[in-house]
C-alpha cells in the first residue's frame, strides 16, 4: 500500500521489526524537522504493527539532545500567522509551476546525508547500527536479496543458516526508500556480488517490474560487469513468508538463468511464475519455546495471550514475541495466537508451525481444523473439553488420537466452558485457559503467574467493579485447580488407529468443495492459482455461508411446541436467520424425519397447514435473543446445549429444502414476513448483532430484486468476506440480492451509480418495447402493456417481467431478441445503500448528502451503533455527548449529529428512525414506505454492538433497543413527503412519551 505514496514528495523510511520502529521513528521525525521534507515512517501493517515484542525503549531525554532546535524554531516561524501574513496554496499557471517544483530539489538532495547522520547518532545511543541501506551477511557474498519491511528479519535467519552451511549469501535491508540514494545503496553492496534478487510486496499489473526492483535495476543500468538482477513478489495480502520461501529465492539465484518476476508462497500453476517450494526448516534459536492457541473471536483468548506474553516478559529476562491471526468474521470467528519466548532475540516474523504447546479453546475445532499439526514430539496439548475424560476420548477423531500416541503428547483437558458459566463469565473462558497454560508449562513459577494474572485483572477490570474482578480472580484459581485440570491417559494402541471414514457430500457444488471447504479448514494457502480460474475479478458465488455449519454456539434454542403462540418474533429478530417458521401440509409432516412436531397454524389464511419453528443448530451462534423476545406466557424457546440439539440438523435440511417457503400470505406484517425465505443468512456477524436483523428483513421483503452497495465496515465484513457470502438466492426464482463493496468513502456515490446504470438500461427496455409494440403478436402486446402499467411497482414487475420475457421468447421479430438481451433489467430494481454511522455521519457523509439531494429513487440504511464498530469502537459524529468511546475516553464533549433532521430539511427525502426491538411493526412500516417512496429514503436504525459492553450481554440486544426508546435516548419517527402532498403533516412521531426515570438504568448498561 505504501508504494501508492511514492509520487507525493514525502520521504519514506521503512522499519522491519518492532525494535526498528522504536529506533527509526526518531530518525524520521528528526530529519523531517531539519530537512523541511515531510516523512512517511512506515512498517508492515499487522505483521509489525500488531506484533508484541520485548524491546529497548529510547528515552525522550536521549532524543531531545538530537533535535536541531534552530530548524525547529524555523519550522514554527513558518507557520501561518496573522502577525506575519503570507499566502500559500496559490493557483499557479504553466509559466512558473514547473520551475517552482524543480526549485525544491536541493531539499531532497540533502535528505540521505541527514538520515545517515541521525542513524549514526541513534546507533551511538542504542548500540544498534543503522544505515539508509543495511547490509547483513557474508562479506564476500555472491548472491544477495534486497527487500524492506518485516521480511528482512526472516531473511536474516535464513542468511545465518545458509552461511553456516557453506553458502555466501547476504541481504540489503532498505530503510530510506525515498529519496532513493545511489550513494548509500552502492556503499552497502559487497564488491563480490554476482546476482541480486529484489523482493516487492506489491503487484503493479502491466509494469515491466515492481517498484523496488525497477529502482535497483536503474542504479546498475549501464555499469560494466553489473550483477544479474531479478525481481519477485511475496507476501501479498499479508500472506505469511517463511524461511523455506527465502531459501527458494537463494536457490533460484544459483540457476544458470534465474527466473525473473517470480512469486513465492503460492503455487502458480497458470503462468507458472512461482518458485518450487522448499522443505520447511526450523530456524528459531535453540531453546525458544513456541505456543499456539486456537480460539474464538470474543472468547478472550487473544486478550489473555497478550497478557501472558507480557507476564512472561516482565517476570523473566526472556525475549518474547506474540502475534495474532484472525479470520474476517466478527466475534465468533477463528483466532490463532502465536507466542514465542526464549533466551535469544526472536526474529521469526512468521507464524508458528512446530509448536511445543497447543491449546484448543473451542471443542468444535477438533472436527474442523488440524489443531495438532506440527506439535513437537513430547509437547503438550490442552483442550477446553465440554466432556469428561472418557467422553473426550470418544469425541476425538482417530487422526488426533494417532498423533497424540505417536508423538508422546502430554494431553490435558479442562471444562473451561462449564467453569466460566458457573462463575458468571458466560462464554469467556480466557482466564481459565490462561491459568491452565501456566500450570502445565511452568514457564514461570505458577504462583508468580497467578499473582501477575490477578494484577492484570485489576488493571483491566478494576473500573468495572469488585464483582467482575472477583469473578476473574476465581477463574484464575479454577484454571490450575486439581480436579478441573485433568491429564488424560493416551493409550499406546491409538498409534494403530486408521483415519475415520470421511463422508463426502457429492451434492456440494464444485466451488464449495474445491475452494470454500479448503479455506474454511484454514488451508487456503494450499490453493493454487488455477483454483481461481473463472474468478479472476474477485467475484464469488452467492449463498456460500450456508455450507459452513460452524457449530460455534454453546447453547441453542429448543422449540417448545405446546407453548408457542405463532407470533414469529423469534425469527424476526434472529441476527443470523438460524430460526424460521415453516408451514407444512399433512403429507409433508408425515414425510418429515421421525419425531418432528408441529401444531395447526393459526389464522384464516393458514387453515389446513401445520406450523413449526425450526432451528439450524450448526448455523446458530447461541445469542439467545429469540428466547428473550418470546412473548409466550411460558417461553416457547429454551436454550439447550448444542450437542443435545444435533438431531435438529436433519429436520432443518428437510424443512429448508423440501418444505420450503410457501407464499400463502402477503408479507404485510411481522408474523407473515417471516414465512418468506431470508436472502441474507448465516453471516459472520457477532452473536446477538444489532445490525443484521434489519438487513435480513429487507432481504425477505425485497431480496429478489435487490441491488446493494455496501460501505466498508462491519456490514461489508459480515456481508462479503471470502469465502462466506451470506446473500443468497430464492430457491424458486433463482433471484437474489446483487451485492458489491467499493470503498469506505464513496459508497453512496457507488450505489447511486448502480441505480443510474440499471435505470438507464430499464428505460431503454421501455423505449424499445413501446417503439416496436406493433411488430409483436396480440398476446405479447398484452404482456408488454401489463409490464408498462406496473413499471414503477417493484413487486408487480416480478410477475409482469417473467410474463413479458416468456411472450418475447416466442416472437421472431429482431426487436424481441434485442429486448431479451436486456431481460435482466425488466424488473424494477430495489437499490439499497448499506453502511454504518462511521460511513454515513463521518467519512462518507458528503456522498450521502449528495445522493439524498439528487432526488433519485435510492434507499439508504444506516445501521447506527454510534461508534466505529469494525475497528474497535472509536467515537464518530454519531456518538452522543458524554459517551465514553475510543478517542473520547473522558466522554464526548459535543452532541450527536442529527442526521435525520438534516435529511428532512430537504423536504423531499423520506426519513425514518427505527429500533426493531422497541417497535417491530414500526420498522416494517418504515422500510415498506421507504422502498415504495419514489425518491431518496434514509433509514437510521439503532443497533446495539459488542463494543457497547452490555452487562446483560448481546443476548439482550433487542431488549436494549426497547430500553433506549422507552427512556427517551432514541426516538422513533417517520417523515414521509407523500403525506404533505395529501395535505397532512409529513412527520409522524412513533415513540411514546419517554419515561426518564429509566434513563440512568439504560446508561448503566
Regions of interest found by a model, annotated:
Residues 1-45, 69, 218, 222-235, ...:
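Conserved thiamine diphosphate
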Residues 39-134, 495, 960-976:
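Conformationally flexible catalytic loops at phosphate/diphosphate-handling active centers
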Residues 449, 453, 462-619, 627-831, ...:
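Ferredoxin-type iron-sulfur electron-transfer modules and their immediate structural context
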Residues 179-180, 184, 192-195, 199-210, ...:
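Active-site cofactor/cluster-binding pocket
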Residues 119-143, 156, 274-288, 545-547, ...:
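Glycine-/acidic-rich phosphate or pyrophosphate-binding loops and their flanking alpha/beta elements
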Residues 1-6, 10-34, 116-267, 273-377, 569, ...:
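Thiamine diphosphate
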Residues 12-74, 238-278, 471-493, 908-962:
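Structural signature of the thiamine diphosphate
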Amino acid at each position: 500500500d505504501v508504494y501508492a505514496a511514492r509520487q507525493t514528495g514525502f520521504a519514506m523510511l521503512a522499519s522491519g521489526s518492532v525494535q526498528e520502529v522504536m529506533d527509526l521513528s526518531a530518525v524520521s521525525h528528526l530529519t523531517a524537522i531539519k530537512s523541511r521534507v515531510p516523512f512517511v515512517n512506515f512498517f508492515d501493517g499487522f505483521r509489525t504493527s500488531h506484533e508484541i515484542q520485548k524491546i529497548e525503549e529510547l528515552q525522550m531525554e536521549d532524543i531531545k539532545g538530537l533535535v536541531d532546535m534552530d530548524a525547529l524554531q524555523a519550522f514554527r516561524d513558518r507557520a501561518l500567522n496573522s502577525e506575519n501574513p503570507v499566502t500559500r496554496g496559490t493557483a499557479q499557471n504553466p509559466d512558473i509551476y514547473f520551475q517552482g517544483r524543480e526549485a525544491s530539489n536541493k531539499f531532497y538532495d540533502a535528505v540521505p546525508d541527514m538520515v545517515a547522520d541521525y542513524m549514526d547518532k541513534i546507533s551511538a545511543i542504542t548500540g544498534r547500527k543503522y544505515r539508509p541501506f543495511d547490509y547483513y551477511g557474508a562479506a564476500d557474498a555472491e548472491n544477495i536479496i534486497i527487500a524492506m519491511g518485516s521480511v528482512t528479519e526472516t531473511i536474516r535467519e535464513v542468511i545465518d543458516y545458509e552461511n553456516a552451511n557453506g553458502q555466501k549469501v547476504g541481504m540489503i535491508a532498505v530503510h530510506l526508500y525515498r529519496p532513493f540514494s545511489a550513494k548509500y545503496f552502492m556503499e552497502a553492496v559487497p564488491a563480490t556480488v554476482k546476482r541480486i534478487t529484489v523482493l516487492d510486496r506489491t503487484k503493479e499489473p502491466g509494469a515491466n517490474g515492481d517498484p523496488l526492483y525497477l529502482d535497483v535495476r536503474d542504479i546498475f543500468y549501464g555499469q560494466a560487469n553489473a550483477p544479474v538482477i531479478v525481481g519477485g513478489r511475496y507476501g501479498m495480502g499479508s500472506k505469511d513468508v517463511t524461511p523455506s520461501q527465502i531459501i527458494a529465492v537463494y536457490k533460484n539465484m544459483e540457476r544458470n538463468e534465474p527466473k525473473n518476476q517470480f512469486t513465492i508462497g503460492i503455487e502458480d500453476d497458470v503462468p507458472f511464475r512461482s518458485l518450487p517450494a522448499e522443505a520447511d526448516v526450523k530456524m528459531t534459536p535453540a531453546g525458544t519455546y513456541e505456543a499456539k492457541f486456537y480460539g474464538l473471536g470474543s472468547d478472550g483468548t487473544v486478550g489473555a495471550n497478550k497478557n501472558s506474553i507480557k507476564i512472561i516478559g516482565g517476570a523473566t529476562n526472556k525475549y518474547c514475541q506474540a502475534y495474532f491471526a484472525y479470520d474476517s468474521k466478527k466475534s465468533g470467528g477463528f483466532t490463532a495466537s502465536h507466542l514465542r519466548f526464549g533466551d535469544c532475540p526472536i526474529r521469526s516474523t512468521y507464524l508458528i508451525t512446530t509448536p511445543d504447546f497447543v491449546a484448543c479453546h473451542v471443542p468444535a475445532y477438533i472436527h474442523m481444523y488440524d489443531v495438532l499439526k506440527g506439535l513437537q514430539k513430547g509437547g503438550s496439548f490442552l483442550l477446553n473439553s465440554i466432556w469428561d475424560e472418557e467422553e473426550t476420548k470418544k469425541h476425538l477423531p482417530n487422526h488426533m488420537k494417532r498423533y497424540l500416541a505417536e508423538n508422546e503428547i502430554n494431553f490435558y483437558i479442562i471444562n473451561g466452558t462449564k467453569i466460566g458459566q458457573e462463575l458468571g463469565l458466560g462464554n469467556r473462558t480466557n482466564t481459565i485457559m490462561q491459568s491452565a497454560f501456566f500450570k502445565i508449562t511452568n514457564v514461570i513459577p505458577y504462583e508468580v503467574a497467578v499473582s501477575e494474572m490477578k494484577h492484570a485483572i485489576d488493571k483491566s477490570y478494576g473500573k468495572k467493579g469488585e464483582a467482575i474482578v472477583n469473578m476473574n480472580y476465581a477463574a484464575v484459581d479454577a484454571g490450575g485447580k486439581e480436579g478441573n485440570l485433568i491429564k488424560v491417559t493416551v493409550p499406546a494402541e491409538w498409534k494403530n488407529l486408521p483415519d475415520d471414514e470421511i463422508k463426502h457430500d457429492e451434492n456440494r457444488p464444485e466451488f464449495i468443495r474445491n475452494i470454500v471447504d479448503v479455506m474454511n479448514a484454514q488451508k487456503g494457502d494450499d490453493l493454487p492459482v488455477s483454483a481461481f480460474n473463472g474468478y479472476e475479478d474477485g467475484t464469488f458465488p452467492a449463498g456460500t455461508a450456508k455450507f459452513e455449519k460452524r457449530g460455534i454456539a454453546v447453547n441453542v434454542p429448543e422449540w417448545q411446541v405446546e407453548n408457542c403462540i405463532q407470533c414469529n418474533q423469534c425469527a424476526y429478530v434472529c441476527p443470523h436467520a438460524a430460526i424460521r417458521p415453516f408451514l407444512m401440509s399433512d403429507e409433508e409432516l408425515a414425510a418429515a424425519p421421525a419425531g418432528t412436531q408441529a401444531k395447526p397454524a393459526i389464522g384464516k389464511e393458514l387453515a389446513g397447514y401445520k406450523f413449526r419453528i425450526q432451528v439450524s443448530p450448526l448455523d446458530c451462534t447461541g445469542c439467545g435473543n429469540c428466547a428473550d423476545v418470546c412473548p409466550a406466557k411460558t417461553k416457547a424457546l429454551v436454550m439447550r446445549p448444542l450437542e443435545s440439539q444435533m438431531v435438529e440438523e436433519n429436520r432443518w435440511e428437510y424443512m429448508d429444502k423440501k418444505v420450503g417457503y410457501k407464499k400463502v400470505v402477503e408479507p404485510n406484517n411481522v408474523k407473515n414476513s417471516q414465512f418468506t425465505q431470508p436472502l441474507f443468512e448465516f453471516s459472520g456477524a457477532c452473536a446477538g448483532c444489532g445490525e443484521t436483523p434489519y438487513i435480513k428483513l429487507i432481504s425477505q421483503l425485497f431480496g429478489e430484486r435487490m441491488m446493494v452497495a455496501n460501505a466498508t465496515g462491519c456490514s461489508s465484513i459480515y456481508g462479503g468476506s471470502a469465502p462466506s457470502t451470506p446473500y443468497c438466492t430464492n430457491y424458486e426464482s433463482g433471484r437474489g440480492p446483487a451485492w458489491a463493496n467499493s470503498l469506505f468513502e464513496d459508497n453512496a456515490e457507488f450505489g447511486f451509480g448502480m441505480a443510474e446504470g440499471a435505470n438507464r438500461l430499464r428505460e431503454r427496455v421501455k423505449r424499445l418495447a413501446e417503439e416496436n409494440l406493433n411488430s409483436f403478436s396480440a398476446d405479447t402486446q398484452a404482456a408488454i402493456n401489463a409490464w408498462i402499467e406496473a413499471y414503477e411497482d417493484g413487486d408487480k414487475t416480478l410477475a409482469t417481467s417473467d410474463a413479458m420475457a416468456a411472450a418475447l421468447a416466442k416472437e421472431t421479430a429482431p426487436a424481441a431478441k434485442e429486448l431479451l438481451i436486456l431481460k435482466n433489467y425488466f424488473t424494477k430494481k430495489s437499490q439499497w445503500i448499506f453502511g454504518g454511522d462511521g460511513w454515513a455521519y463521518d467519512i462518507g457523509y458528503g456522498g450521502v448528502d449528495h445522493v439524498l439531494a439528487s432526488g433519485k429513487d435510492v434507499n439508504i440504511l444506516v445501521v447506527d451503533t454510534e461508534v466505529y464498530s469494525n475497528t474497535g469502537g472509536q467515537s464518530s459524529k454519531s456518538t452522543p455527548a458524554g459517551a465514553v468511546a475510543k478517542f473520547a475516553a473522558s466522554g464526548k464533549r459535543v452532541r450527536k449529529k442529527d442526521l435525520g433532521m438534516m435529511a428532512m430539511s430537504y423536504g423531499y427525502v423520506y426519513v425514518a428512525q427505527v429500533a426493531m426491538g422497541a417497535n417491530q411493526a414500526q420498522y416494517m412500516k418504515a422500510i415498506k414506505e421507504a422502498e415504495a417512496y419514489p425518491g431518496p429514503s434514509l433509514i437510521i436504525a439503532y443497533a446495539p454492538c459488542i463494543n457497547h459492553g452490555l452487562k446483560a450481554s448481546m443476548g439482550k440486544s433487542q431488549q436494549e433497543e426497547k430500553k433506549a426508546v422507552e427512556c427517551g435516548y432514541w426516538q422513533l419517527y417517520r417523515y414521509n413527503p407523500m403525506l404533505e402532498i395529501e395535505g397532512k403533516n409529513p412527520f409522524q412521531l412513533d415513540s411514546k412519551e419517554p419515561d426518564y426515570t429509566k434513563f440512568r438504568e439504560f446508561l448503566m448498561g
